[in-house]
Regions:
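Transmembrane-helix signature of 12-pass secondary carriers
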Residues: 1-463
Length: 463
């Protein structure tokens, strides 16, 4: 076991052992440390997804309390997404330059601060500005969740453990709707309007999580690309010692064939050779998936009020439908490392395309809840598969930037989505909204089938 836990950097053919960090991490058996890391990172996903789906809840609540019109309701949903667009572009690129851990702390700190201020917003203008700023803080959260976990987790469980993190994260979606329904029904708590408590809860939870994340190590893969091999060695050796103590035996040997050192690469590398094909495929994917995936979650409460239900009823029905998000995420866990990611993405997207129009045409309460639930189940099998898949498309030196820039396109689409979708909803009704969404999901399937590479079960450095 001395070959894996020695504190003295081993050299192999003149190359420090830091260049073998990726292969050493990949061959580790999953441990309590890996599970704890997944838990801490997954809680961050909870607050990101809570915030994303909170926009639809706030739009439904404030439309009634502040008598908002069509444009104002759309703006409440869009403001956070616009902030996420800017944040994803800026913070994800900074994460490739300054490190994953540092940006983890910056983004949660910014979100907690501005979300707390948002709870005190006196009018719509202040609310929109502060929603934008809180979204700016969260812009790169899911990008960093994917990147950080992928760079630490052993390849044999990479997909499954990222799915665990998102299963925890997606509990935030029904929580946002259920809290909204309860707090709206209560009208005020300690003299403060219920919807403001939704923002306070997110801010305080994120602030607590930021304190927990201060103990996280930097990604050894990122350190290795930066030429900081000694630091990478210390982190990997410490992890090896921890896992060896837990398992009580020798660690698996490092496969020599998998020692593929990575290097710093310029951002322009995204548009050269094989990376260009993957970049184009993923940009198209992110624009299309936003409509089919976030379209339902962010618009469902507003769509249900358009069907004639009260705000409280709409939030309750949405919350019941949203229970499919964590359940769908849990369902993906046994599938994600057994079925090729690309195939699973396409199958789940077809499920979304089928359930969306059924929800749009539904009038009976049981049908609304049933098809909404099935849609969210399919959505999170889809979501977990693509979050794992995108970490496997790009090399370490580009991973955060490439994923973040593509993700920012989805946030930009999300800015326009409520204005377009609510106009279609007003003029043509819910069925037209979800039929159009289904058509875009079918285009997404073609994009992934034609341009997406296979990735399941391979080392990040070998895809």
């Amino acid at each position: 076991m001395t070959d894996t836990t020695s504190s003295t950097p081993e050299r192999r053919g003149g190359t420090p052992i830091g260049a073998r960090a990726a292969a050493r991490l990949d061959r580790l058996p999953p441990s309590r440390w890996h599970r704890g890391l997944t838990l801490i990172v997954g809680i961050g996903a909870f607050f990101d997804l809570y915030e994303i789906f909170l926009g639809g809840v706030l739009a439904a609540v404030l439309a009634d309390q502040w008598h908002l019109g069509h444009t104002a309701k759309s703006s409440v949903i869009a403001a956070g997404f616009l902030g996420m667009f800017v944040g994803a572009n800026v913070l994800s690129v900074l994460a490739d330059r300054f490190g994953r851990r540092r940006m983890f702390l910056v983004n949660l700190g910014g979100y907690a601060f501005f979300s707390l201020l948002c709870a005190a917003a006196p009018d719509l203008s202040w609310l929109l500005v502060l929603r934008f700023l809180s979204g700016l803080g969260l812009g790169a959260e899911l990008v960093l969740v994917d990147t950080y976990l992928a760079e630490f987790l052993p390849r044999a469980v990479r997909g499954r453990y990222i799915a665990y993190a998102y299963t925890l994260g997606f509990v935030g979606v029904p929580v946002a709707a259920l809290l909204g329904a309860r707090l709206v029904a209560a009208h005020a708590l300690f003299g403060i309007e219920g919807w403001r408590w939704l923002l306070v809860a997110g801010a305080l939870g994120a602030a607590f999580l930021q304190l927990m994340r201060r103990r996280l190590p930097e990604s050894p893969r990122w350190l290795m690309v930066q030429g900081r091999d000694a630091e990478a060695e210390r982190i990997v050796a410490g992890l090896e010692e921890r896992v060896a103590r837990e398992t009580g035996g020798s660690l698996p040997s490092v496969p020599e064939a998998e020692t593929v050192p990575e290097r710093k690469v310029p951002l322009a590398e995204m548009f050269r050779g094989e990376q260009r094909r993957r970049t184009v495929m993923w940009w198209i994917f992110q624009v299309l998936q936003t409509v089919g995936y976030y379209g339902f979650g962010s618009l469902a409460p507003v769509v249900l009020t358009a069907k004639g239900h009260t705000v409280t009823e709409s939030l309750l029905y949405a919350a019941l439908s949203f229970c499919g998000y964590p359940l769908g995420s849990a369902l993906s866990i046994p599938l994600i490392d057994r079925i090729e990611r690309r195939t699973l993405i396409i199958a789940a997207a077809l499920g979304i395309a089928g359930c969306g129009p059924a929800f749009g045409f539904a009038t009976a309460t049981w049908a609304i809840v049933t098809f909404g639930f099935l849609l969210t189940v399919c959505s999170n099998v889809f979501s977990n598969a693509f979050h794992v898949y995108q970490t496997e498309l790009f090399p370490t030196g580009l991973r955060s930037s490439a994923i973040g820039i593509a993700y920012s396109l989805s946030r930009l689409t999300s800015v326009a989505l409520p204005f377009i979708a609510l106009s279609v909803l007003t003029d043509l009704g819910p069925a037209a909204v979800f039929t159009g969404s289904a058509a875009l999901m079918l285009l997404l399937c073609v994009d992934v089938a034609l341009l997406g590479p296979r990735s399941t079960g391979r080392s990040l450095e070998r895809i």
